[in-house]
């Protein structure tokens, strides 16, 4: 399992920016009625904008994904959905099935299930991001959520059809020190799951040596930029505007 150990202060500036985005919407006030609905929409809009900036400036800007730019250019090719409930705590039990999901399944997993089913049944979007700005701030908790999402793909019999890529503000490879710039290849403004179609991935980048070399090339790129530059790039995407 990836190491969730964190040193105080390393990612505080990213956390501060996320807090500004969330508090600026008024969501924390738990206002009733139209005010709460407006706050939730504001949160969703801010998170979607920050996520898109991250794709444009970091993922595409640093060349981390060979076909991300083309996806951005095509209408309806990318879906960015935001889970704004903050209810990320329960799990899917081993006895669950696709037709009989757990009654206590949390909102984020329900949203992930819905997105996965839509991608299995419809040609659009080509790829999708589920962003969870509240409830998965702890990296180890996020890894548990990722495992539950993988389990759901199995329950839905979508293993081999869809695959997941994982991104988190505090992402850390288990073999890397916390200040290794390589960690930024999988760091994002908010915790998120990237849902990809396996057929699309193979068509775009293949399954041979080029595909296998992408992670190593990304690590080399991040390390050549350095920790401070990578942190600044990520921070600029999550600043409240």
Regions found by a protein language model. Give the residues of each.
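Expand to "…catalyze enediolate/carbanion chemistry for C-C bond making/breaking, isomerization
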Residues: 2-5, 12-13, 17-19, 24-241
């Amino acid at each position: 399992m990836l190491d969730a150990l964190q040193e105080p202060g390393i990612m505080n500036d990213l956390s501060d920016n996320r807090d500004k985005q969330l508090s600026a919407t008024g969501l924390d006030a738990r206002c009733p009625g139209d005010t709460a609905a407006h706050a939730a929409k504001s949160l969703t809009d801010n998170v979607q904008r920050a996520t898109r900036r991250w794709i444009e400036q970091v993922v595409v800007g640093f060349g981390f994904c060979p076909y991300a730019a083309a996806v951005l250019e095509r209408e309806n090719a990318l879906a960015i959905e935001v889970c704004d409930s903050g209810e990320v705590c329960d799990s899917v039990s081993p006895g669950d099935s696709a037709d009989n999901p757990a009654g206590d399944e949390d909102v984020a997993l329900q949203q992930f299930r819905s997105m996965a089913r839509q991608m299995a049944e419809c040609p659009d979007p080509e790829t999708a991001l589920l962003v969870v700005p509240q409830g998965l701030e702890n990296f180890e908790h996020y890894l548990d959520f990722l495992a539950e999402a993988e389990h759901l793909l199995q329950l839905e019999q979508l293993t081999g059809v869809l695959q997941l890529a994982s991104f988190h503000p505090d992402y850390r490879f288990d073999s890397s020190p916390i200040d290794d710039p390589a960690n930024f290849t999988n760091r994002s403004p908010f915790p998120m799951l990237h849902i990809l179609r396996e057929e699309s991935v193979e068509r775009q980048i293949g399954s041979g040596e080029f595909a296998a070399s992408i992670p190593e090339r990304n690590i080399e790129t991040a390390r050549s930029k350095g920790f401070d530059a990578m942190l600044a790039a990520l921070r600029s995407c999550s600043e409240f505007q």
